[in-house]
């Protein structure tokens, strides 16, 4: 998973992610928006999941985050449509709206995101 953090013209932190993980970047840009308290909450929930079978989710305005003890899924809330209903052009959009990654990789992203915000 390749990614970078930048500032836009207004000074807002923007996260850009490689193909297959774009939804993680969209989630950071749309739902987190530099909220360090939210990052801390997510990190605490992830720590509580270790070694358990439990899952945790955080539903936002545009994206929902799901965590379990090993994996993370970020999914656009508008993906409630059945995939059979999507034409080929929409399947590409669908792929940009769903990302899966390992929990440890995701937590590393959050750590680097926090560091970028605090340093700039």
Swiss-Prot record:
Pfam families: UPF0231. It comes from the Bacteria. InterPro entries: UPF0231 (IPR008249). Belongs to the UPF0231 family. This is UPF0231 protein NT01EI_0766. It comes from Edwardsiella ictaluri (strain 93-146). The lineage of its organism: Bacteria, Pseudomonadati, Pseudomonadota, Gammaproteobacteria, Enterobacterales.
């Amino acid at each position: 998973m390749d990614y970078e953090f930048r500032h836009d013209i207004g000074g807002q932190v923007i996260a850009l992610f490689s193909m297959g993980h774009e939804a993680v970047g969209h989630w950071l840009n749309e739902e987190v928006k530099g909220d360090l308290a939210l990052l801390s909450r997510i990190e605490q929930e992830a720590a509580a999941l270790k070694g358990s079978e439990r899952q945790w989710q955080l539903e936002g305005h545009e994206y929902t985050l799901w965590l379990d003890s090993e994996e993370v899924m970020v999914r656009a809330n508008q993906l409630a449509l059945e995939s059979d209903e999507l034409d080929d052009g929409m399947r590409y959009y669908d792929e940009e709206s769903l990302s899966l990654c390992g929990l440890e990789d995701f937590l590393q992203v959050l750590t680097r995101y926090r560091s970028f915000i605090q340093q700039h």
